């Protein structure tokens, strides 16, 4: 490992440490993430040829075409990152439109309960199954908006929000469209929809239920429900009940339609999100036109053109910085070397290898980790490495559920961290060990099913 490679790793680790101690340094994590991005890629450009020869052995352009090649690599990573960012912005805007126009009012009525523990289980179950249909990112945004309607105490809401992260990641792990890593494995033909649902569903449930059982001990007594009328809660008082329900179903139904749109058109998911946003935007404009509002009324402040300013840009920039910094680690070969090293150290024990990969996925982005594994391990005709084999199914589970162990270990965690202002330190102290217990329990459950039930 060269000095330059070590320097890049040091910059990443230092930035990661500063993000982890945001509550102490009082420096916004988005600023640190952007500095990580620039620092890692600037060091990379000091001697890119060694990395081109390592990661792109087919490159024959020499020094003359080096800059052009690296520029293309960065643009490719930026394109991949951009699809995530546009998806995030679109989903956040859609949920904001539904929320501000009273679309979640009736959901609030359905979820309403005075018992803190009863609400915890309703939130857990709804998040789990919604994440399997949508994705953990969109589900987390929707559930946080619903929680804000139900829970006024921020300390209690942090507990609920933490369970949203765990349930969203667990729910996405057993569904071929629930998480970006399962989508990758499914599209590559390494797992089948029927196989991953049949064998990962129960471990995923276990990884959610056990943390929920522990977390409910942190919640005692009854909720103080926010006393807000439907008209106040809707923000736009002149919207009828039918219009509010239309906004809800166009928004949430549209989000459910996104994976269907992707499977039909084979376009990236962000295109489907933009389609839903366009349809919902048009519908609300038609509703407003029928209200004949003046330009300065309160209701017009809730139109999409006004709501766009409410999108949390610091979260978007944080995503940009983290994903691009991790892509630099991928380009210097660190992630691939790490995966190969795990296989050697643990002598091909796939439970240990995938288990460690799951832990690592809570530290760095799980996408390059899974991509590295897909490139390192060939598909076998039979055995653990076959389609729907132990390795690939455990990889889907571990890469998805493992991200719950740290709040910045998954897209769901990062979004909830930004929306609810949960610090890295608080989550690590109170939630990480709980998520880890659920994670291990799910692996043990999978081992039991494969070893005993499938052996019958």
Task: Describe each PLM feature range.
Residues 40-51, 78-79, 130-167, 171, ...:
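Membrane-interfacial helix-loop connectors
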Residues 79-89, 195-213, 265-278, 352, ...:
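Alpha-helical transmembrane segments
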Residues 1-4, 24-27, 55-59, 66-84, ...:
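Interfacial loop-to-helix junctions that mark the boundaries of transmembrane helices
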Residues 4-7, 153-154, 158, 174-175, ...:
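Juxtamembrane and boundary regions of transmembrane helices in multi-pass small-molecule transporters
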Residues 43-76, 92-109, 129-141, 328, ...:
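Transmembrane alpha-helix boundary signature
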Residues 6-15, 26-63, 81-93, 244-254, ...:
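Hydrophobic mid-bilayer segments of alpha-helices in multi-pass membrane transport proteins
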Residues 9, 34-35, 85, 120-125, ...:
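Hydrophobic alpha-helical transmembrane segments
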Residues 60, 79, 101, 108-110, ...:
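Transmembrane helical segments that form the transport core of multi-pass membrane transport proteins
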